Amino acid sequence: MLTKLNILLIPLIIIMFLQCSKNPASTKKEAPIDLTQAEKRLVESDNKFGLKLFKEIVKEEKDKNVFISPVSVSMALGMTYNGAQGKTQEAMQKALELNGLTIQEVNECYKHLIETLTQLDPKVQFQIANSIWYRLGFTPEQEFIRLCSKYFDAQVEGLNFADPNAPHTINAWVDENTNGKIKEIVDDAIDPSIIMFLINAIYFKGIWTYQFDPKLTEDGWFYLPDDSIKICKLMAQRNLYRCFSNADFRAVDLPYGDGEFSMTIFLPESEKNVDSLIAKFDSDSFSYWISGFTMSNDSFDIYIPKFKLEYGLTLNEVLKALGMAMAFDPFQADFTKMYQGGGVWISEVKHKTFVEVNEEGTEAAAVTSVSMTYGVNHSDFRVNRPFVFVIRENKSQTILFIGKIVEPTL
């Protein structure tokens, strides 16, 4: 049966976060994550950077689906940050919102977060992997390698980049660490000027705490930004939910597994434009909204589209706009802590993601590669128009994925 709501058509946003806050939907006793003040500041820094990154991308990808993983980008650039020196390090520190944190604090915080977040919920698969691949004949600074290995658990390998099998070796690592969802990040032929790849990979698979019944999934109307209508599969469920609403949007929280992770969907009010909602997303607002979620008094229906998306882009221009231009300048970049001889700069930051949402749960993956070159309304909640959703871990407020969907695809 086709269903329709008389509402304004607005673009769809998808935002997936890793968020830490108490989730009443979970029935198990929660063991809190003990975060130091530095770790709390790092989480806040990653969220600030992730939201700035998302907004900048959305400017360029208007009325398009967007899906990124801020934490993946942050970790790949976090390893790179260990090789920066002088004004280049200062520029990266500012762009990544790391002011007030020493590099030692940054490294120790990432180490603890990697160890903690991957072990929180036995019913949710959440994996983080890092690697560094350098050209044989190029000798990276050993202290740089030691730091990335110790704090980011990075696998470090020297390869003959001229060997036709070298890209396959790197891409096989990517494929393995995203459970086959992202097949490659390195081109078939590696540019002779590239001397290193710093790569982060993330894989997430969460089963809904309360799964959707496939028998209730039906065709429904989804309203696109150009006023057209797309027929998509709408999943349906009636339950009690943690909710929040204000003049701009309504939001519902859907837990995974034991409740350590969840997806939060932000649906703009019908008369609001989704881009105006994006403009209001910042770290402080997000934390305020999440703290305001409460359990609904009554059960109500929600309708969510099934969708699958593969997304990718080069982040060079976006990162330059955020203040990192010097790191991309072969004449100004200073990565002498990575290679003492100098002359090394970032030639490309490539980002790829995957997400699939269905009745069972959500599967998502992300890969970021840094190429270093030498020289609450409780009525029915029907998600049939552009909306925002957040996947979060419910305790640490680290943003994991953030995206924008203007058209559900399978």
Model-derived segments and spans:
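Detector for small/aliphatic-rich hydrophobic stretches
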Residues: L2-F161, I405, T409
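Composition- and surface-driven signal marking solvent-exposed, interaction-prone regions
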Residues: L5, Q211-P214, F266, S276-F281, ...
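Short Gly/aromatic-enriched secondary-structure transition segments
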Residues: M92-L96, F212-D219, V274-D284
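Non-catalytic, conformational "gating/processing" segments within enzyme and secreted inhibitor domains
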Residues: I103-E269, I290-V376
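C-terminal, non-catalytic macromolecule-binding modules
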Residues: S283-F286, L319
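C-terminal soluble interaction/assembly domains
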Residues: E348-L410
